Structures are given as structure tokens and as C-alpha cells.
Amino acid sequence: MAFLKKSLFLVLFLGIVSLSICEEEKREGEEEEKQEEENEELSEEELRERRALLDKLKSLGKVVGKVALGVAQHYLNPQQ
């Protein structure tokens, strides 16, 4: 009978230990997934910021080009 008690306690102990290890791994997995989602959100925000910056630079380039064209035409055609 004592042998069965010891065996039963050993099985229960090992089951509890393995269960706690599984729970810990599950929590770590959830934390990693959450962190990956945050990284994806950050990268999406960075992409939006870069697109906005490129749009501003594009607009600025158009304005500078028009000004340069106007100055060049003014100096090439000084009749006015």
C-alpha cells in the first residue's frame, strides 16, 4: 500500500510540474504574439509616416520645379 501511495504522489507531482511548465510556455507564447502584433502596428505606423513624408517631399519638389522653371523662363526671355 505504501508503494502505491508513493507512486501516486509521484505521478501527481510530475503531472502538476508538467502542467505548470505548459502554462508558463503558454504565457510566454501569448506574450510573444502580443509583442509581434505591437511590432506590426509600429511598422504600419512607420509606413504611414514615411508615405506622408514622401508625399510632402513630392509636393515640395513640384513647387521648387515650378519656381525654377519660372526663374529660368524669366532670365531666358527678358522681354517683359
Curated annotation (Swiss-Prot):
Record has Secreted as a keyword: yes
Residues covered by region (Disordered): 27-46
Entry's localization field: Secreted
Positions with biased composition (Acidic residues): 30-44
Tissue: Expressed by the skin glands.
Pfam families linked: FSAP_sig_propep
Residue stretch(es) of the prosequence: 23-49
Keywords attached to this entry: Amphibian defense peptide, Antibiotic, Antimicrobial, Cleavage on pair of basic residues, Secreted, Signal
Keyword Cell membrane: no
Name used for this protein in its record: Raniseptin-7
Naturally occurring in which organism (per UniProt): Boana raniceps
